[in-house]
């Protein structure tokens, strides 16, 4: 894996890349509280089969500039800008958690840029809005989002003791906790060990919550046209398994395939990397 810097949609992105420069492009988008490093098992696997795999730190994370806005329309435009910056017409876009929400939005708003879509443990934005209004269970699972609306305090709590709460969140949100070795967790703790390093990541939640309350939702248009794969770790503490219902998903992506991964939780690409790689590469090879 090689570090890479890109300018897209008006800001500088830090990224990791692997694979031949002329290979088909796969763009991998991480979630919270993660970094491009969360794709460390997928980047070499994709490269070994001839893909050019690129995983950026999202806007406001890690080595990427922390500059708003952080609304879904802007974040989807980041994806289109990265595809352009890499000199391509389109890409396979893979996303987990917040990266998956952004990938869904990009597949709606920048249809020409997303030739195939892969989403891991991330609800469709419309489905999440509906569940948050209708489901006591999902509101309970998402109670951390409400806590994140408090100014200043979440940044301080998450960053104190050298990001110890970040480590607890990664382990606590996983079904297979042993993948988070102390050495691995140190990479994430150091990325979020000061309050200012969390300003951008928490702005995703604050902007999304405010826009939902004010009903300023982005207009996504019709269903996703790109072939879509949804991989879902079934022991997800934060998201209802109903989000992985194939019949439900066909409302948003008619050409969808759903694969449920029973022995994994929310951080599925870290908890079950071999299974994720197997399913991803099989589907891409169709």
Protein language model features and the residues they cover:
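N-terminal cap/lid segment of alpha/beta-hydrolase-fold proteins
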Residues: 1-12
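Conserved HGGG/HGGXW glycine-rich cap/lid loop of the alpha/beta-hydrolase fold
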Residues: 17-63
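Catalytic histidine-centered segment of alpha/beta-hydrolase-like enzymes
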Residues: 264-273, 277
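Flexible "cap/lid" subdomain of the alpha/beta-hydrolase fold that forms the substrate-access gate
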Residues: 11-13, 52-54, 61-94, 98-260, ...
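Short, flexible hinge/linker loops that cap or flank conserved catalytic cores
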Residues: 7-9, 19-21, 26, 222-224
């Amino acid at each position: 894996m090689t570090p890479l810097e890109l300018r897209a949609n008006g800001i500088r992105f830090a990224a990791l890349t692997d694979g031949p420069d002329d290979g088909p492009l796969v763009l991998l988008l991480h979630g919270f509280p993660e970094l491009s490093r969360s794709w460390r098992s997928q980047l070499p696997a994709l490269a070994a089969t001839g893909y050019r795999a690129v995983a950026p730190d999202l806007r406001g994370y890690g080595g990427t500039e922390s500059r708003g806005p952080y609304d879904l329309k802007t974040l989807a435009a980041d994806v289109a800008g990265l595809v352009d910056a890499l000199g391509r017409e389109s890409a396979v876009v893979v996303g987990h958690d917040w990266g998956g929400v952004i990938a869904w939005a990009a597949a709606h708003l920048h249809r020409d840029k997303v030739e195939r879509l892969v989403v891991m443990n991330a609800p469709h934005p419309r489905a999440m809005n509906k569940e948050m209004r209708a489901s006591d269970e999902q509101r309970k699972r998402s109670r951390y989002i409400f806590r994140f609306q408090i100014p200043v305090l979440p940044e301080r709590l998450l960053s104190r003791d050298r990001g110890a709460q970040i480590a607890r969140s990664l382990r606590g949100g996983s079904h297979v906790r042993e993948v988070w070795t102390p050495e691995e967790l140190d990479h994430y703790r150091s990325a979020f060990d000061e309050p200012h390093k969390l300003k951008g990541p928490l702005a995703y939640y604050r902007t999304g919550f405010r826009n939902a309350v004010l009903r300023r939702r982005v207009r996504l248009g019709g269903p996703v046209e790109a072939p879509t794969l949804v991989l879902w770790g079934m022991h997800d503490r934060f998201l209802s398994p109903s989000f992985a219902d194939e019949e439900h998903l066909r409302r948003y992506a008619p050409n969808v395939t759903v694969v449920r991964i029973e022995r994994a939780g929310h951080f599925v690409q870290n908890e079950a990397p071999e299974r994720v790689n197997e399913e991803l590469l099989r589907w891409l090879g169709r």
